[in-house]
Curated annotation (Swiss-Prot):
<comment type="similarity">
    <text>Belongs to the alpha-type phospholipase A2 inhibitor family.</text>
</comment>
<keyword id="KW-1015">Disulfide bond</keyword>
<dbReference type="GO" id="GO:0005576">
    <property type="term" value="C:extracellular region"/>
</dbReference>
<keyword id="KW-0964">Secreted</keyword>
<comment type="subunit">
    <text>Oligomer composed of five 23-25 kDa subunits. Homotrimer; non-covalently linked.</text>
</comment>
<protein>
    <recommendedName>
        <fullName>Myotoxin inhibitor protein</fullName>
    </recommendedName>
</protein>
<dbReference type="GO" id="GO:0030246">
    <property type="term" value="F:carbohydrate binding"/>
</dbReference>
<comment type="function">
    <text>Binds to and neutralizes the activities of basic phospholipase A2 (PLA2) myotoxin isoforms.</text>
</comment>
<keyword id="KW-0430">Lectin</keyword>
Amino acid sequence: DEVDPDGKVLNSLIDTLMHLQKEFANLKYAFLTVHKARSFGSGSERLYVTNKEIKNFEPLGDI
């Protein structure tokens, strides 16, 4: 006896997996975009960017 003769459960799982793969790809792209926008290198000095200022990471070591 087949529990899912029409493959509805399997098709539903495949659809869900494909949706999650797309969401993960979008999340990964969004993270990389934010990371690239927020930090960048200038020579050997690492910089960070906020909406208010651009500074290097050295002052952050005092926190």
